[in-house]
Structures are given as structure tokens and as C-alpha cells.
């Protein structure tokens, strides 16, 4: 609905309109107009038109359809690159724009092709390339989660964060960018991950000192998950060297690069280059 002027949908329950409208309101799309048609072509046919934010508690007949009208649809992003200043930041650390672009590229996320194959061993029909399930561990302001959500409409991004101030920023940024496929989970990653579906892709920007436990949990859920990690401190970089052994144990590829970004800034009438902190980026899988 974010990217289209009109979206029509069939409804299967009396509370379905309310649930959709609640979700739209949560992500800052409460001003979308909703037209609900109940029992169309019957003598008691009824048409209701209201804003989504005003339909969060209403119930409708099970025989209903709805049209969602967005007067200000946004063009769909084809590549990452939201400017840092666009995010609501506070004092919470944020993965910067250039690093985000490399991280997202290294995650290598692909959307569901819709192709279904029959697996002879299990006797079941299986999706050849399922919709992505992405963890953002230590999500901070949500800059990576937001970019991933906007680029991966078929998937779900789980933003995991333990700091209350950061969780507030996650909600604020999700509403600002109108992201509907991003779930925010407050708590320690090692306690949250067991409750989630198996991931296809994981970004770890912060681990709270539980990196190896988190890695074990991820591989227990999906040994083929693709994982990207970043580190700025020497202590975290030292931990990353151990990840090479973990990758070998799980028989997955391991790659480590260092990224150093230098940005221009104004100094009176002049322009100078200012170096940012170097960042280590590890890719596994």
C-alpha cells in the first residue's frame, strides 16, 4: 500500500479490516482512505468510507471487500542509500550510510520466486527460494532494518534491541518510513532468537557480549543462514577472528574486509576530508 495509489483486497473475517488498519496506523499510514463494501449485490449492501486510523475497532460482515486509497504513494527503492540525516537518531549508535550499503550487498538477499518443487525425499512440495526472514541483531536506530524492509517487501525483518532508548527510536523510524514488514522485539538477542522463525539472513551490528551464543542459536535454526557482522572496537575484532574457526566447523565460506570511509566537510570557506572510524565486516555463508 505504501507504493500504490489503490489496493483492492478480499476479506475473510469480521475483524480483518480492523487488524489491517491497526497495522497501517502503527507504521504511520493511518491517513490512508479505506472503502469497505459489505454484502455487495444483496439488499442490505453497505458501503463504508473512513480513514484507516478510524477503523481500528470496527467490525464488518464476513462477506466484504476493501479498497485502500493512498493519495501519496512512494516510489519503491531499488537500492539502499537513505541519507543518515533522514533517520531519527538521538544518542544511539547507527550503522552509517556507506557501511549499510556494503552490509546489505553482502547479505545478498533474494526474494521468493514463487517456484514450487516436489521433494522426493520428503514427499512434500517446497518453495525453491522462500521469502526472506531477516534478523537485525542490535538494531540500534533501525537504519539497517529500515533499508532492508523497504528493499525486501516479500520478507520480514526482525529488529532485535535491548536498550529502551533504541527501541523507542526503532518505533519512531518505522513510523516515519511507513515500514509494514518490520517487527520490533525488545530484549536480549539470546533470549529473543529462540522465539523467532528460522532466519535466512542475519545482520549482527551489536551482540551485548553474547556473540558466540547468538551464533550457535542461529546455526541451530538454520545452518545455511547467511550472516554479516560489523565491528568497530578492537575487542569485537578479536572475537571475529574466532569466527573463522566457527565457519570452518559449519563448512561455510568466511570473508573479512576492513572499510574506511572519509567524508568531506566544510571548514569555513574551505572543504576538508574527515576520516570515519574503520569498520570490519565479516561475511559467513
What are the functions of these language-model segments?
Residues 215-278:
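C-terminal substrate-binding/active-site "lid" region of AdoMet-derived donor-dependent transferases
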Residues 5-8, 198-206, 213, 226:
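Short SAM/SAH-binding signature in class I
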Residues 6-91:
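A contiguous loop/helix-start segment that scaffolds small-molecule binding in enzyme catalytic cores
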Residues 161-166, 206-207, 232:
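Short beta->alpha hinge that forms the Motif I/post-I loop of the SAM-binding pocket
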Residues 130, 150-156, 221-223:
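Conserved S-adenosyl-L-methionine
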Residues 112-120, 131-140:
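Conserved class I S-adenosyl-L-methionine
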Residues 160-199:
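S-adenosyl-L-methionine
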